[in-house]
Swiss-Prot record:
Keyword Phosphoprotein: yes
Protein name, UniProt field: snRNA-activating protein complex subunit 1
Source organism (scientific name): Homo sapiens
GO molecular function, one term: RNA polymerase III general transcription initiation factor activity
Protein localization: Nucleus
Residues with Phosphoserine modification: S289, S290
InterPro entries the UniProt entry points to: SNAPC1
Example of a GO biological process term: snRNA transcription by RNA polymerase III
Gene Ontology CC terms, in alphabetical order: nucleolus; nucleoplasm; snRNA-activating protein complex
Entry keyword set: DNA-binding, Nucleus, Phosphoprotein, Transcription, Transcription regulation
Region Disordered: start-end pairs: 224-257, 275-368
Region of interest (SNAPC4-binding), residue spans: 164-268
Ranges where the record places region SNAPC3-binding: 1-168
Self-association state and partner proteins as the record states: Part of the SNAPc complex composed of 5 subunits: SNAPC1, SNAPC2, SNAPC3, SNAPC4 and SNAPC5. SNAPC1 interacts with SNAPC3, SNAPC4 and TBP.
Length: 368
């Protein structure tokens, strides 16, 4: 029987939430256990055989996260998960946790690390499981059979829970740093003893910098911080989001200040009255500070300019109309002998004829 569908997803969800708490306390794990209602995982209508098989698979899955290469926090969470699954199972007698002999040394080493780090709640949980005889020691991790398989199924390692191998941290441990500090202090004391001036050592003896150990310590701390940020990109993204929000707020305030300054400059510019020359004082336009008055003033200026253009164009238009009339008359005169229509008498000829008749009438009256 393989891993039941959904069981691995639920276990990884619980462990991932426990990892987000950044804690190894049993109280935090029990709170997540209650919120997810993980105690009801064995509830349901199952026969005894199915119940036993399901419990074995659940305990084997939790035991997988208790061993390397997973991080210390995930291993502690897996220990709490084993304790919860073992005590909430419904099998009678209880199914035990299958432990291979080759892994037991690693388990004892982890127990010692818990005690040294003073994580007594996790150490107590492990001791309680041992006293309850929850472990079943076997030669192999899985039950072997006579069936031959061409492809051996290997359990996939969850990368999120995996403890990345860091050669720098393996090389420079806390013990190595402490030993380097002792050697550096001894070296500085020996320089003072050898030199003539006890207060100041000779420059010829200073083969390394005085802050050599401090520089190495700072580099190691920076590497640890970079390693944490790489392992938990969510925390780094949150800090970056906070910085971006602060930068966005500062940019918005700068834009508001610029807009206010531009508005003040515009108001000052439009509040000043333009003084026209003496010849154009009758066309002077007053401008107010508001945008509406400035727009109306601009409209008035445009209207006055249009009127000036029309006045200038009027005499020129009259001259052009008179010229056009003369040209039309000349054209009619030239066309007279060619056309058979009646002659056209202009207003000037009518006036001359009328004046001629009046002149002849006045002569006749004088004669009489």
């Amino acid at each position: 029987m393989g891993t039941p569908p959904g069981l691995q997803t639920d276990c990884e969800a619980l462990l991932s939430r426990f990892q987000e708490t950044d804690s190894v306390r049993f109280e935090d794990f029990t709170e997540l256990w209650r919120n997810m209602k993980f105690g009801t995982i064995f509830c349901g209508r199952m026969r005894n055989l199915e119940k036993n098989m399901f419990t074995k698979e659940a305990l084997a899955l939790a035991w997988r996260y208790f061993l390397p290469p997973y991080t210390f926090q995930i291993r502690v969470g897996a220990l709490y998960l084993l304790y919860g699954l073992y005590n909430t199972q419904l099998c009678q007698p209880k199914q035990k946790i299958r432990v291979a002999l080759k892994d037991w040394d690693e388990v004892l080493k982890f127990q010692q690390d818990l005690v040294n780090a003073q994580h007594f709640d996790a150490a107590y949980i492990f001791r309680k499981l041992r006293l309850d005889r929850a472990f079943h020691f076997t030669a192999m991790p899985k039950l072997l059979s006579y069936r031959m398989k061409k492809k051996i199924h290997r359990a996939e390692v969850t990368e999120e829970f995996k403890d990345p191998s860091d050669r720098v941290m393996k090389l420079i441990t806390s013990d190595v740093l402490e030993e380097m500090l002792n050697v550096h202090d001894h070296y500085q004391n020996m320089k003072h003893v050898i030199s003539v001036d006890k207060s100041k050592p000779d420059k010829a003896l200073s083969l390394i910098k005085d802050d050599f150990f401090d520089n190495i310590k700072n580099i190691v701390l920076e590497h640890q911080q970079w390693h944490k940020d790489r392992k938990n990109p969510s925390l780094k993204s949150k800090t970056n989001d906070g910085e971006e929000k602060m930068e966005g707020n500062s940019q918005e305030t700068e834009r508001c200040e610029r807009a206010e300054s531009l508005a003040k400059i515009k108001s000052k510019a439009f509040s000043v009255v333009i003084q026209a020359s003496k010849s154009r004082r009758h066309r002077q336009v007053k401008l107010d500070s508001s945008d509406s008055d400035s727009a109306s003033g601009q409209g008035q200026v445009k209207a006055t300019r249009k009127k000036e253009k029309k006045e200038r164009l009027k005499p020129a238009g009259r001259k052009m109309s008179l010229r056009n009339k003369g040209n039309v008359q000349n054209i009619h005169k030239e066309d007279k002998p060619l056309s058979l229509s009646m002659p056209v008498i202009t207003e000037e000829e009518e006036n001359e004829s009328l004046s001629g008749t009046e002149f002849t009438a006045s002569k006749k009256r004088r004669k009489h």
